[in-house]
Amino acid sequence: SGGSPAPTTPPANPPTQNPPPPPPATTPPANPPGSGTPQDEVLRLTNVERQRAGCGPLAFDASLTAAAQAHSADMATNNYFSHTGQNGSTAGSRAQAAGWPNGYVGENIAAGSTTPAATIQMWMNSSGHRANIVNCAYTHLGVGYAQGGGTYRHYWTQAFGRR
């Protein structure tokens, strides 16, 4: 579900006290496609890959986007990387809580990549993530993106659904 960021060297003068906690994640509002957000670009690039695979385009879905955005923000705020939320939530339970009508969802998560293009490339290079992107049964997509001060700094979520 994503690799580690490039290794870095330790600071020349290590701090003598604990660093302050990471700032809260910034969570841009869930905007519909066409608004020029990173989420919009992930949707566009996902549909490019689906077209190459012979699948129809995914439609933007506000409920799936709310679920994906909340999960990305939670990972960024709480400095973890998992399909299971800190409260035990799953992709399906998050989607249903956000208003998706059934639990049939797929999810891709990524961390550390700084652009939509790099994130899509990571997913396309992973067979399990690629399978979600080119699963022609899916009809709708929600995308979440958040930045935080944690280990990976950039957290991405795709929530796929079928109606």
Question: Which sequence ranges carry the predicted segments?
Answer:
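N-terminal targeting leaders of exported, membrane, and organelle-targeted proteins
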Residues: 1-66, 70, 146-163
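Solvent-exposed aromatic/hydrophobic patches embedded in short alpha-helical segments
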Residues: 45-47, 76, 119
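Short, surface-exposed glycine/acidic/tryptophan-bearing loops
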Residues: 66-114, 133-135
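Disulfide-stabilized extracellular recognition modules
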Residues: 111-163
